[in-house]
Structure formats: structure tokens, C-alpha cells
Amino acid sequence: MQTNTRKVVTSDAKWHPHLGISFIGCLLAITLEIYFEERIFIPHSGGVSFGLIVLLVINMVTIPVVMALIALLCFIIHIPRKSVNCILLCLLSCILTIAGLFIAYPVGR
């Protein structure tokens, strides 16, 4: 007897291998934002940890958006997984996450 089983092929999903790279880029952006927190325009009037709380809240919103944008980009445009492309996608997600901070913060004021 033959059984008809459906095979899930991960090579068809072009966006799947790049999710980890975009997440690493977002973590790099969070690290840079925390390191340069004093130079970012977030006021410290609410206490010492107010700036870190604002950074974490904004990044919890921007990280899924950035990962979805990178996944959509990789799904539409087939980007082979080479080391140069991985580094560029990591930098792109880092830049988008930092840009998301500067876009989202004035709206939340």
C-alpha cells in the first residue's frame, strides 16, 4: 500500500534561513542602543532605568516588524545564503531597528 504523505521542503521557503540573521542584527541594534543610551535623545527624568525601559518597549515592537520586512524581502527576492549576503542582511536589520527607534519615539512622547 502506498501512503500519500506530504513532504515539507524547506528549500522552497526562501525566507526561512534569513530569520536568524535578521534576529542577530536586531540584537546588535539593541546592544548599540543600550551602549549609546546617553547620546540618544531619551530623557532621564523618570529615573535611572527609564531610558532602558523605553528602549526595550520600543524594540519589542520594532523587532517583529523588522524581521517580517526582512522575511518579506527574502521571499520576494531570492537572496542566496552566502556570507556577504548574511552580513548585509544583518546590517540592514540593524539599521532598520535603529531607524525604528527614532521613528517610534517621537510618536510615543
UniProtKB/Swiss-Prot annotation:
It is found in: Cell membrane. The keyword Transmembrane applies. This is Uncharacterized protein YpfK. Its main location: membrane. It comes from Salmonella typhimurium (strain LT2 / SGSC1412 / ATCC 700720). It is a multi-pass membrane protein. Keywords: Cell membrane, Membrane, Transmembrane, Transmembrane helix. One of its GO terms (cellular component) is plasma membrane. The chain crosses the membrane at residues 16-36, 52-72, 87-107.
